[in-house]
Amino acid sequence: MNANPFLKGSLQTIILKLLEDNNEMYGYEITQKVKEMSGGDVLLTEGALYPALHKLEADGFLETFTQVVDNRVRKYYRLTEEGGKQVSSKLSEAQAFIDQLQTLLNLKPAVK
């Protein structure tokens, strides 16, 4: 993953939101979706992604299942009911953090 500490601290939130939007995804698919959504600016490494996925699973926010695709076993992740609740909580925390940064640094919201 890029060296940006803000992104590292937001990885679980990003994963949860992606799974909320896409229902179920496998690891490589998550990395490619983040790359696509960021215009190539955010590159998730396996070393960053899989520990975050395993932590979310251990915390009961994700469940997994496997499926054979092209003679390869692929591990998919999806939100549990508790994980679904966690998404809105994490998004609220992220929004509050962004609001605080904008206030403290006197930043204007980005317009795209």
Positions of predicted regions on the chain:
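Intrinsically disordered, low-complexity serine/threonine- and proline-rich regulatory segments
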Residues: 1-7, 90
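Short, contiguous hydrophobic alpha-helices characteristic of membrane insertion segments
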Residues: 4-5, 61, 112
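N-terminal helix-turn-helix DNA-binding core of bacterial DNA-binding proteins
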Residues: 5-48
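Beta-hairpin "wing" of winged helix-turn-helix
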Residues: 57-73, 78
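Amphipathic alpha-helical dimerization/coiled-coil segments
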Residues: 85-112
